[in-house]
From Swiss-Prot:
Gene (UniProt): GBP130
Disulphide linkage map: none
Protein name: Glycophorin-binding protein 130
Organism of this sequence: Plasmodium falciparum (isolate 3D7)
Function, as annotated: Involved in merozoite invasion of host erythrocytes.
GBP repeat placement: 226-275, 276-325, 326-375, 376-424, 425-474, 475-524, 525-574, 575-624, 625-674, 675-724, 725-774, 775-824
């Protein structure tokens, strides 16, 4: 019994001891593992910091090297130019001195002989005949010596100090005037004395030539300057507080040598002190759509095209209540626009030898509503229409046409939308011509001249009418095929012209008139779009619009239309838009937008048959809208009871330079919302950020993008103010990203025989949550480089290939300042 108990005690004790040891050992092992892990983590963090530091140093070194290299290159270039100018100046001075030296030799020889003969006559009475003979012989010898010395001196001076002749001649003239006889006696001495004197002043002419060759540039202390660069067409933009400069685009192979269009748009909202301007060029519509900014801008032209284009358009509108003035002008080949509260200038379009037929710039517009802090950004490519369609925005559109293209284009567009509550109606844009009527009691627009066997059958129409009984909101929009001329302000104006090409538009005589008046708000809006040209009159009592470029055997049948409708049940917001023949597809949802373009190329899209459907349903704010645009055609339907949009064929030697414009502005009395938008045909340059903007380029190359086939989609959903809208527009390509406040734009390189099948898409998404509405949009033509953030900016270039844009050097500047809201 005892033994068994003892054994039991021992066994239990041993087991307890083992359990205790096992527990302690497990604890210690865990502690060791944790310590090892901590050491590893610390080492890893240390190594990662080292790596980051190394990469940072490398980045700084590379950045410094890049900056130094750029400065060195500029310094070398400047030194080379300066040395070349100085050398040219010295050559000119040497030539002048040689000519003067020849004249001086002849004068000195004649003078010395005359003085010697006079002295001989005086000495006749005193000297005998023998002395006379001797004196004559001596004098003759002296004169010969003097002449020889003068000649030798002149030769030596010409070789050594060719710049002293002028002063020598002056001294001789002074001696002649004084009439002193000492010149005859001391001719040798005088000639010797003149040498050192001339040598003393020999350096003065060189200093004068250097001073003449210098160039100085001085900027005033208060002068604000902003520069920006845009490729293909190149859209140079500067969008500062109040100023504006736009600017130049070099032209290539005998192109756009004379293009000089102008456009101006200004709009002001007394409540928010908001100014909005917009412009759309035919080849390019560069736009800046900030609180008060603006941008316009480019149009591509082709070989033997627009070489003499010189259209002008003026629009002026004045609203006695708000003191609003708006002017606008758009050339076909170029749409020059100035779109700032007070400033603007629009600009040039580069074109190349059979190049940039598809160039596509982008345009951005941004608007901010101080009450709701709303931001909107948008971008449209050349081939594509850059659009911004915010709470109350708009769209614009163009379609480029190419070599012998769109000769038979016959697209149509109709849009009819009716909102029983608000009685809203919007309508459309023609291909070759965009005929539009854009007012609550709107107007009819509409003619397009046709050219040498061109546009003989063009018959586009466009109507836009919108009425919002609750908010008294009115919106109009227009887009031409060749150009979309738009006026997008409560009382603003649009611009309008289209350059004409080879034996084109020589007789064009289109007219367009639109006048709208809202008795409550005293709002006037007019708009017009020509096919090759958008003829527009955009003022309460304004304007004439105007020209349409067409090409040799081009756009003979172009007839596209465009429609856009938007409904916002909560805010009673209405938006209308227009799309050109080339394609202006727009959708303007609760506050969104759509854009679209279609590039067409050599023997391309001759049979294009794209379709577009848009269906929108509003059921308890569950609104949805979709739309698509083909490359050859933009088919769109844009209404709750939507629409069909349509087709634009383009053909060989057609619409190569078509450029439409588009502008839209909408006001929401409750939220004081204003939005404008513009899209160029070849390029739509837009700036749509709180204060930033970029527009973007689309490179196109030799025989490139001939088969581009982009698509566009727009979908909008309004569910408890959760509105989303997307849109896509490729011309050759439409690259778009349109987030609530973000932006993505982007580049599309194209190469020789490249992007012939490019098919980019564009998305636009807009979200309204507690009135925090943001909309962004981007469209590249071949490429649309865009960045559209709430306040960001991206601009960007696309290099062009195959002997393209090698010399492009355009500049654009826009600056606007809003003192009240400090909006830029």
């Amino acid at each position: 019994m005892r033994l068994s108990k003892v054994s039991d005690i021992k066994s239990t004790g041993v087991s307890n001891y083992k359990n205790f040891n096992s527990k302690n050992s497990s604890k210690y092992s865990l502690m060791e593992v944790s310590k090892k892990n901590e050491k590893k983590n610390s080492l890893g963090a240390f190594h990662s910091k080292k790596i980051l530091l190394i990469f940072g140093i490398i980045y700084v070194v590379l950045l410094n090297a890049y900056i130094c290299g750029d400065k060195y290159e500029k310094a070398v270039d400047y030194g080379f130019r300066e040395s070349r100018i100085l050398a040219e100046g010295e050559d000119t001075c040497a030539r002048k001195e040689k000519t003067t030296l020849r004249k001086s030799k002849q004068k000195t020889s004649t003078r010395t002989v005359a003085t010697q003969t006079k002295k001989d006559e005086e000495n006749k009475s005193v000297v005998t005949e023998e002395q006379k003979v001797e004196s004559d012989s001596e004098k003759q010898k002296r004169t010969k010596k003097v002449v020889k010395k003068q000649i030798n001196i002149g030769d030596t001076e010409n070789q050594k100090e060719g710049k002293n002749v002028k002063k020598v001649i002056k001294k001789e003239k002074k001696k002649e005037e004084s009439g002193k006889p000492e010149e005859n006696k001391h001719a040798n001495e005088a000639s010797k004395k003149q040498e050192p004197k001339a040598s003393k002043v020999s350096q003065k002419p060189s200093t004068s030539t250097r001073s003449n060759n210098e160039v100085k540039i001085r900027a005033a202390s208060n002068q604000e300057t902003l520069t920006s660069a845009d490729p293909e067409g190149q859209i140079m933009r500067e969008y500062a507080a109040d100023p504006e400069y736009r600017k130049h685009l070099e032209i290539f192979y005998k192109i756009l040598t004379n293009t000089d269009p102008n456009d101006e748009v200004e709009r002001r909202n007394a409540d928010n002190k908001e100014d909005l301007t917009s412009a759309d060029p035919e080849g390019q519509i560069m736009r800046e759509y900030a609180s008060d900014p603006e941008y316009r801008k480019h149009l591509e032209i082709f070989y033997k095209i627009l070489t003499n284009t010189d259209p002008n358009d003026d629009v002026e509108r004045r609203n006695a209540d708000n003191k609003e003035d708006l002017t606008s002008a758009d050339p076909e080949g170029q749409i020059m626009r100035e779109y700032a509260a007070d400033p603007e200038y629009r600009k040039h379009l580069e074109v190349f030898h059979k190049i940039l037929t598809n160039t596509d710039p982008n345009d951005e517009v941004e608007r901010r509503n101080a009450d709701n802090k709303e931001d909107l950004t948008s971008a449209d490519p050349e081939g594509q229409i850059m659009r911004e369609y915010a709470a109350d925005p708009e769209y614009r559109k163009h379609l480029e046409v190419f070599h012998k293209i769109l000769t038979n284009t016959d697209p149509n567009d109709e849009v009819e939308r009716r909102n029983a509550d608000n009685k809203e109606l919007t309508s459309s844009d023609p291909e070759g011509q965009i005929m539009r009527e854009y007012a609550a009691d709107p107007e009819y627009r509409k003619h397009l001249e046709v050219f040498h066997k061109i546009l003989t059958n063009t018959d586009p129409n466009d109507e836009v009418e919108r009425r919002n009984a609750d908010n008294k909101e009115d919106l109009t929009s227009a887009d031409p095929e060749g150009q979309i001329m738009r006026e997008y302000a409560a009382d603003p104006e649009y611009r309008k012209h289209l350059e004409v090409f080879h034996k084109i538009l020589t007789n064009t005589d289109p007219n367009d008139e639109v006048e709208r008046r809202n008795a409550d708000n005293k709002e006037d809006l007019t708009s017009a779009d020509p096919e090759g040209q958008i003829m527009r009159e955009y003022a309460a009592d304004p304007e004439y619009r105007k020209h349409l470029e067409i090409f040799h055997k081009i756009l003979t049948n172009t007839d596209p239309n465009d429609e856009v409708e938007r409904r916002n049940a909560d805010n009673k917001e209405d938006l209308t838009s227009a799309d050109p023949e080339g394609q202006i597809m727009r959708e303007y949802a609760a506050d969104p937008e759509y854009r679209k373009h279609l590039e067409i190329f050599y023997k391309i899209l001759t049979n294009t048959d794209p379709n577009d459907e848009v269906e929108r349903r509003n059921a308890d704010n569950k609104e949805e809208l979709t739309s698509s645009d083909p490359e050859g055609q933009i088919m769109r339907e844009y209404a709750a009871d939507p629409e069909y949009r349509k087709h634009l064929e383009i053909f060989h030697k057609i619409l190569t330079n078509t450029d439409p414009n588009d502008e839209v502005e909408r006001r929401n009395a409750d939220n004081k919302e204003d939005l404008t938008s513009a899209d160029p045909e070849g390029q739509i340059m837009r700036e749509y950020a709180a204060d930033p903007e970029y527009r973007k380029h689309l490179e196109i190359f030799y025989k490139i993008l001939t088969n581009t086939d982009p698509n566009d989609e727009v979908e909008r959903r309004n569910a408890d103010n959760k509105e989303d809208l997307t849109s896509a527009d490729p011309e050759g390509q439409i690259m778009r990203e349109y987030a609530s406040d973000p932006e993505y734009r982007k580049h599309l390189e194209i190469f020789y025989k490249i992007l012939t099948n490019t098919d980019p898409n564009d998305d636009v998404e807009r979200r309204n949550a507690d009135n925090k509405e943001d909309l962004t949009s981007a469209d590249p033509e071949g490429q649309i480089m865009r960045e559209y953030a709430a306040d960001p900016e991206y601009r960007k270039h696309l290099e062009v290939f195959h002997k393209i844009l090698t010399n492009t050097d355009p500049n654009d500047e826009v600056e606007r300042q809003n003192a009240d809201n400090n909006e830029a």
